Amino acid sequence: MTTAFDIADIKRRMAGAVTSLKQELGGLRTGRASASLLEPITVDAYGANMPLAQVATVSVPEPRLLSVQVWDRGMVNAVEKAIRDSNLGLNPNTEGQTLRIRIPELNEERRKELVKVAHKYAEAARVAVRHVRRDGMDLLKKLEKDSAISSDDMERLSKDVQKATDETISEVDQTLAHKEKEILSV
């Protein structure tokens, strides 16, 4: 009789927080080139702001080099301007319809700043997971109060929710540790 409570939905919502964290961390600049570094950039194209991925192809030919192949020759200057204005500290060199972006080494101070930002993102993900947990527990309490589930079911499902929370927060911590190691490695 526990049809009103779906643990799979709770797990899916918690996994969404981890996915969001991974996307945010992917946008943090480390010392290595990564195509995801340019994902948040929007280009003023054809009278609208468009994601860079809709006007160009980004590739990583070398560990410290990004290559941006612009599809429309008329968009090269707009793409270059968008990359320069992105606050990522990147300086593209134009060669025809291709922009080459050398990724500079990060200094120690900038690395520490990036680690702090990564910790903020991870904490936001943990908070999101805890909110999902709270929502699940509130629903369980309501179902128990309305006699839709027994106290034994309440106990079992509460443990399932807590287990899912612990597993997800552990995944957040592992993701953060991996990114921190990546940022701090010279």
UniProtKB/Swiss-Prot annotation:
Transmembrane segments: none annotated. GO terms for biological process: cytoplasmic translational termination. Keywords: Cytoplasm, Protein biosynthesis. The keyword Protein biosynthesis applies. The keyword Ligase does not apply. CDD domains: RRF (cd00520). GO terms for molecular function: ribosomal large subunit binding. GO terms for cellular component: cytosol. Its main location: cytoplasm. InterPro entries: Ribosome_recyc_fac (IPR002661), Ribosome_recyc_fac_dom (IPR023584), RRF_sf (IPR036191). It is found in: Cytoplasm. It holds the Pfam family RRF. It comes from the Bacteria. HAMAP family: RRF (MF_00040). Responsible for the release of ribosomes from messenger RNA at the termination of protein biosynthesis. May increase the efficiency of translation by recycling ribosomes from one round of translation to another. Belongs to the RRF family. This is Ribosome-recycling factor. It comes from Azorhizobium caulinodans (strain ATCC 43989 / DSM 5975 / JCM 20966 / LMG 6465 / NBRC 14845 / NCIMB 13405 / ORS 571). The gene is frr.
